[in-house]
Regions:
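Amphipathic alpha-helical elements of HEAT/ARM-like alpha-solenoid repeat scaffolds that form extended
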Residues: 7-8, 21-26, 42-43, 54-65, ...
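Short amphipathic alpha-helical patches
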Residues: 67-71, 124-131
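Flexible helix-coil junctions and inter-repeat linker/turn elements that act as hinges
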Residues: 32, 50-54, 66-72, 90, ...
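Hydrophobic alpha-helical bundle architecture
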Residues: 83-124
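Long, low-complexity, highly charged intrinsically disordered regions
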Residues: 1-56, 71, 75, 193-194, ...
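Eukaryotic acidic, Ser/Thr-rich intrinsically disordered low-complexity regions
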Residues: 129-222
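Short sequence/structural elements of tandem HEAT/ARM alpha-solenoid repeats
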Residues: 21-26, 35-43, 56-61, 72-80, ...
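Helix-loop junctions that connect tandem helical modules in alpha-solenoid scaffolds
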Residues: 45-49, 83-93, 125-130, 169
């Protein structure tokens, strides 16, 4: 954190007991300038991306901050999302791409962002960039897993209505959704196989224990 403002925001977040406390700490800093609001969002994203594993604290903090600040925060978040989806992803590690995408997904689910931000994607980049595919697959994977049924229906409709069918980005979006569905199906198949294997192992263990113990002495009384 290279400036006093960034350090102040960082300490407000890191000293919080929970995300509501964190949002209250940030509010106490009385940051009024639009550039200050943007800096808060930058620090939230940087802190989230620095974690070894994704921490939902930052998604909830982002939501609480946007709710408290209103339009200024929503506009700054939209600008930040445009940058992440436009050209900044190449300089990020895979962990940073994943964690930042989880934040964007949360913002989409809670309607702090609209799907129109996906239009900032470079045309054709999805098929040619592994990080861009990771970014979008993470966003939609999180939406499929976290959104309610009604919210999911609304989000999918909003996603496709944001694009023209003649737009190359529409084709990219279709491919991303197909990739996510395939990944979810593979995950489900793996879970089913694991459950089946566990059941077979349990039955095999029970059979071996039964053979070792032999017939119950009570059976001779029947």
């Amino acid at each position: 954190m290279t400036t006093a403002l960034k350090r102040g925001i960082f300490f407000a977040i890191s000293n919080a007991e929970d995300y509501l406390h964190g949002a209250a700490n940030i509010a106490r800093l009385q940051l009024k300038q639009s550039s200050d609001v943007r800096e808060v969002l930058n620090v939230i994203f940087k802190c989230a991306c620095s974690e070894k594993k994704e921490n939902p604290f930052y998604s909830h903090l982002l939501g609480a901050y946007c709710k408290n600040e209103g339009r200024r925060a929503l506009f700054s978040l939209k600008v930040l999302a445009f940058e992440l989806l436009e050209d900044n992803v190449g300089a990020m590690s895979e962990k940073e791409v994943h964690h930042s995408s989880c934040l964007l997904a949360h913002a989409l689910i809670e309607e702090y962002l609209s799907f129109s931000v996906l239009k900032s994607m470079q045309t054709g980049e999805v098929s040619g960039s592994a990080k861009r595919r990771l970014q979008l697959c993470t966003i939609f994977d999180r939406i499929f897993k976290k959104a309610s049924r009604d919210r999911l229906k609304h989000l999918i409709n909003a996603a496709f209505s944001s694009f023209s069918a003649k737009d190359r980005s529409f084709e990219d979006l279709q491919q991303v959704l197909l990739d996510v569905c395939a990944a979810l199906r593979l995950s489900l198949e793996t879970d089913i196989k694991n459950v089946d294997a566990a059941n077979r192992k349990k039955k095999s263990t029970e059979d071996r224990v039964g053979e070792a113990l032999g017939p119950s002495p009570l059976t001779s009384l029947i």
